[in-house]
Amino acid sequence: MADDVIDWLPYVDTLDQRYLNEVEKTVTAELAAIEQQELHPRIAELFPAVRHHWDEQYGLYKDNVVGLEGSNKRAAEDGVLSELKRRCPGIDISVYNDDSEDPVLLATIAGYRYHQDLVVTQLLPQTLENQWAINNAYLEGAEAAVRRQLQEQEQQIAQLDRHRQELQQREALRFRYLERQWRDRLHGNLERAAGNI
């Protein structure tokens, strides 16, 4: 059946159900064979990839630790942690020594801690709420854009189907005439061929 040529006009012709079943089966098999690891490129444009600042560290962890068990895993984790601390030493805590008697250093420590307290108790909740609202608004806008595009495409498909239907119905008489003419010539050729035998 793979070599059969099917010439079919859906709004004029009738088609045997077995052909439709075969087409559905083939389409299902082809769709199952397609790997869809990514979103459609137009969707990916709306949602650009965000690189997390821990991606590199996680890659190091994944390369060295994942798959290990027991003491081997613990030793590998310690090695990864040492490497990360070497690469990214963080804040030097020795600068903020509470045991110091130096009033300037103690004032610096107090200011730093007060700043941390303000950030955690007042600024962070406001910022998170604003970030949440901004992200929600962005996602709603992106979703609306995708829905609009989908609706436009569905309308275009429906319009194209209506055009095809009108065209096929308008030309149905010509198709029947051409088919009848083809059959008559075929019969005539067969009769002539049979008469020559």
Swiss-Prot record:
InterPro entries: SPF27 (IPR008409)
GO biological process: mRNA processing; RNA splicing
Entry keywords, A to Z: mRNA processing, mRNA splicing, Nucleus, Spliceosome
Domain of life of the native organism: Eukaryota
Disulfides per UniProt: none
One Pfam family it belongs to: BCAS2
Cellular localization per UniProt: Nucleus
Keyword Nucleus carried by entry: yes
GO cellular component: spliceosomal complex
Function: Involved in pre-mRNA splicing.
Subunit structure: Associated with the spliceosome.
Annotated protein name in UniProt: Pre-mRNA-splicing factor SNT309
Organism field: Eremothecium gossypii (strain ATCC 10895 / CBS 109.51 / FGSC 9923 / NRRL Y-1056)
